[in-house]
Amino acid sequence: MWGSRIAVALRILVVLAILPVFLLLVYSLPFVRPVSTLMVKDYALLQGVNRQWVDIENIAPVLVNSVMMAEDGQFCSHGGVDWHQLGLVLDDAGDGGPSRGASTITMQMVKNLFLWNGRSYLRKGLEFPLALIADAVLSKKRIMEIYLNIAEWGPGIYGIEAAARHYFKRSAAKLTARQAALLAVTLPNPALRNPAKPTRNMQRIARIVAGRAMRSGPYVTCVK
């Protein structure tokens, strides 16, 4: 009895391990429009989901640059995981310094696609191999496109097109530099941050991000 149960459990684990790889291969097709686990949950609970897919060519470049500078400045140069940044985070933790994140855009994408929210060592441990596989399977441009279309920008607001229209009454293609920066700094905490009604601290950070986006030329070539 126990032998058969173990065999079934192993088969399930194998399927769970293979499924994300298979889905990433499917998501490499440009006409496929992935959804996040949060979106699936909202659909299952019959809650409203505001998401309008938009190709990356129809997203203002200043938004792409702002998100990259705010979330993952080395996006074009790492292989899915920023090992240097991770090392700095571990050093800070060992020294008792303030905690900071080391999640790359690729890691955030796979978390949104396959995993769950909330702090968890298990979830973080799963992000690493999934991000490495995603970086090997998908182009940087496709990773950014998927990320910008599944990221949460507020309760029930998924993707940059829905966010741009909800907060600024315009398409993602027509965002200004200031609007792009405010949307970028909303990403770490969309439940509490409102880009249309930014706090002074949000405005301060957005100005920094906007400045970096203006000077981001060498860092964003992989999404051109």
From Swiss-Prot:
GO terms under biological process: cell wall organization; peptidoglycan biosynthetic process; regulation of cell shape
A GO-annotated cellular component: plasma membrane
Protein location: Cell inner membrane
Root EC class: transferase
InterPro entries from the UniProt entry: Glyco_trans_51, Lysozyme-like_dom_sf, PBP_transglycosylase, Pep_trsgly
UniProtKB keywords: Cell inner membrane, Cell membrane, Cell shape, Cell wall biogenesis/degradation, Glycosyltransferase, Membrane, Peptidoglycan synthesis, Transferase, Transmembrane, Transmembrane helix
Transmembrane segments: 12-32
Protein name: Biosynthetic peptidoglycan transglycosylase
The species this protein was found in: Brucella suis biovar 1 (strain 1330)
Gene transcribed to yield this protein: mtgA
